[in-house]
Structure formats: C-alpha cells, structure tokens
Regions:
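C-terminal and inter-domain tail/linker signature
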Residues: 1-137
C-alpha cells in the first residue's frame, strides 16, 4: 500500500470515531490491535479501544476529534489531533462540570494489510484536567 493509502486509513479511523460507529472500527483496525495501556483498567486490542471511546462519550457526549496534521513514512502514520467536547457526564470518577474542553494529542498508527495493527498515543491530560477545574497548576 502507498503512503497516501495509509493516510486514508487513518482518516477513515477518525471519521468512524467521530460518528461513534464503533461496529465499523473493524473496517480499519485489526482485531489484534497492539496498544499500550489505553486507560487504567482498559485492556489492549480493538475492544479496549472501543471501551476507551465509550468512556470519553460517557463524559463528553459531543466528543469529536480533528486531525490537525498527518504525516506518513513507510508503514507508519502520525496524526496531531485536537479533541473537544462538553463534560455533561461522569468522566473517570469526576462528576459532570458542564465545561467545554479542547485538548491536543498525537498518535502513531502502524498499518499492515490495510488495517491499523499498532497504535501509540499521548494526550494532554493535564490541560484536560485543568479545563475541568480538577487540577490547579
């Protein structure tokens, strides 16, 4: 597959998440997805990715992600993203604040056989917690 095809897979991955169509995730993500621990208590793999997204949707029902930059080389695609939503539900033990948040992240996806097989990501959790008003720095 070409680099442009790899980037197209990552764009599709993000579209599926933004539509909250987790059943469609298997179109672009391997069932055996390798990830580091996504969130405490969440398993790795495609089911863990789905569970982590459900946690975000519980806390932020209007949760969306925008791809700000997309780079690819070989079998890897890197995305710089901005995530946003309004905290109207409980989120990881934090009661709803009603606050709109916007925070950034970056991830690298490795593509094989037309699917994401590995995913590494980092988000600005400090900014998220500051905007929710639960972390003062």
């Amino acid at each position: 597959m070409s680099i442009e095809e790899h980037k197209k897979i990552v764009r599709r991955y993000q579209e599926i998440y933004n539509r909250n169509d987790l059943d469609a995730l298997s179109e672009v993500v391997s069932e055996d997805l390798l990830t580091p621990k996504i969130m405490p208590g969440i398993p790795t793999g495609i089911e863990g990715a789905k569970a982590a997204h459900r946690i975000m949707l519980t806390g932020f029902p209007d949760y969306q992600t925008v791809i700000d930059d997309l780079f690819a080389e070989g079998d890897k695609v890197a995305a710089r993203i901005t995530m946003s939503g309004t905290n109207t539900g409980s989120f990881m033990g934090i009661p709803p604040t009603g606050k709109y948040v916007s925070f950034t992240g970056i991830y690298i996806a490795r593509i094989a056989n037309g699917k994401i097989v590995e995913h590494w990501g980092e988000e600005d959790g400090v900014s998220l917690l500051q905007q929710l008003g639960v972390l003062n720095m």
